[in-house]
Regions:
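Acidic helix N-cap motif at the loop->helix transition within catalytic regions
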Residues: 83-84, 109-118, 140, 164
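Catalytic donor-sugar/metal-binding loop of nucleotide-sugar-dependent glycosyltransferases
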Residues: 245, 254-272
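Long helical/loop segments within the catalytic core of UDP-sugar-dependent glycosyltransferases
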Residues: 50, 122-123, 132, 137-139, ...
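Short beta-strand/loop segment that forms part of the nucleotide-sugar
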Residues: 97-106, 129
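N-terminal signal-anchor transmembrane helix
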Residues: 21-33, 42-97
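Short aromatic/hydrophobic "clamp" motif used to bind/position activated sugar donors
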Residues: 152
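Membrane-embedded multi-pass helical conduit in multi-pass membrane proteins
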Residues: 11-42, 48-53, 63, 321-411
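A conserved acidic beta->alpha catalytic loop
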Residues: 104-112, 133-134
Length: 418
């Protein structure tokens, strides 16, 4: 209701802007333009802010489960990081049995040898499988056939776990109802001292992605149990048919849970450190995959097929995301340049009404994250330049890239994973 009230207020406040813009575009076009760059982003921001304010304070989970768990790691040429990934698993403060299944997906380096050596040195229970058909979903489904534990975790081969990560993730799933099919872990950036792009993404993971997941989890409708680090009920994954043949296999599987009347949560205390792209070309490829994955989910699991109203609401919001990206790319960015020449019809003072709400969200989440991560003994020094890049530049890069990803999926172009 607060978000709707904010939307009504902004529409009322924007009437002079509508009047000015409609002189050039017409009334209907003016409303459509302003909806893409102000109304819809403002509504989503107000909804997020209100939800976070109503949420409980950050507390570490107290349960200490001992349920047997299987970790699936799909790997292709991960010689560089697989040893350290396994070493972090060996340091877990978890009382239960941890089985690890490494699925080699056609590696041409020493990934398997390195993994076997590390497992022998650390005493890990490691099974190595081989799946020659390329594709992460093929590798994960090959490993799924060997899972005989109630819970399973997917972990990327270059992702390092905090010592309490598995305990907190398993505790969240254990105390949740049987209709909670998965819990997403919290990802922070591992290579945060790398390139400028890596420092920008550090803030994106720390603030933006965390705030969205935490907000969605309040309603048990986290839209992505990411493959990099999430826990699942094994029988729920099998009932959903395993991971689909999609470039966004984790997104589509999550939505399959919704279709099967399941729910998905997020545990902010279950922290893992992942490696983000440092080069522009790798970042573009990653974000195209994410954009295509969202469209795949919308096509394979339409929001109107989901019975639960909250999950239907959140998946339905993704229907307007391409429109927001379109408006940002072709209206907001050109509008900024026009501001320099004194034309404020597209972007001006009224447009900036969205910015304070967004900054308040980031400020509140920063306080939440600092308190929570402080309890875990995690203290990362973050780049101020990266913060400025995240707030003022990053979306200008990501929105056009997302549009190209949508287009690639629409025209069924070849999928590129790396």
């Amino acid at each position: 209701m607060v978000a709707i009230g904010w939307l009504i207020f902004v529409i009322w406040l924007s009437q002079p802007w509508i009047h000015q813009l409609s002189q050039t575009t017409g009334v209907i076009a003016a409303y459509l333009i302003i909806a893409g760059i102000a109304y819809l982003p403002g509504y989503i921001s107000a909804f997020t802010l209100t939800s976070l304010l109503l949420d409980k304070k950050a507390e570490l989970p107290t349960a200490n489960p001992s349920i047997p768990i299987t970790i699936l790691i799909a790997a292709r040429n991960e010689e560089k990081g697989i040893g350290e990934t396994l070493e972090h698993i060996a340091r877990q403060e978890y009382l239960g049995i941890i089985k690890i299944i490494l699925i080699d997906n056609g590696s041409t380096d020493r990934t398997v040898e390195k993994a076997r050596q590390t497992a022998e040195r650390t005493g890990l229970s490691l099974m190595i499988l081989h799946e020659e058909i390329p594709g992460k979903h093929n590798a994960l489904n090959r490993g799924l056939k060997e899972v005989n534990t109630p819970f399973l975790i997917t972990l990327d081969a270059d992702t390092f776990l905090h010592p309490s990560a598995i305990r907190f993730l398993a505790a969240k799933l254990q105390i949740s109802g049987p209709d909670v099919h998965a819990v997403a872990g919290s990802l922070l950036v591992q290579n945060n001292r790398g390139s400028f792009l890596a420092r920008v993404q550090e803030w994106e993971y720390y603030l933006s992605i965390a705030s969205i997941k935490r907000m969605q989890s309040i309603y048990q409708s986290t839209l992505v149990a990411q493959g990099a680090f999430s826990i699942f009920r094994s029988d729920a994954v099998k009932a959903a048919g395993g991971w689909p043949d999609s470039i966004g296999e984790d997104i589509v599987l999550t939505w399959k849970f919704f279709e099967n009347n399941g729910r998905v949560c997020f545990e902010p205390a279950a922290v893992a450190f992942t490696e983000v792209p440092e080069s522009f070309i790798h970042l573009i490829r990653q974000r195209k995959r994410w954009a295509r994955g969202m469209i795949e989910a919308l096509k394979q699991v339409s929001p109107w097929k989901i019975k639960d109203p909250t999950s239907r609401f959140f998946t339905g919001l993704d229907l307007v995301v391409p429109y927001i990206d379109l408006a940002y790319t072709f209206i907001w960015i050109p509008g900024l340049f026009l501001c320099a020449f004194g034309y404020f019809g597209l972007v001006g003072p009224n447009t900036l009404m969205v910015l304070p709400v967004t900054l308040i969200i980031f400020y509140l989440l920063n306080l939440y994250q600092k308190r929570l991560l402080g309890q875990l003994g995690i203290h990362q020094k973050k780049s101020f330049i990266g913060l400025l890049g995240f707030i003022f530049v990053f979306q200008m890069i990501i929105a056009p890239v997302a549009l190209s990803g949508y287009a690639e999926e629409f025209f069924k172009q070849k999928r590129v994973w790396k």
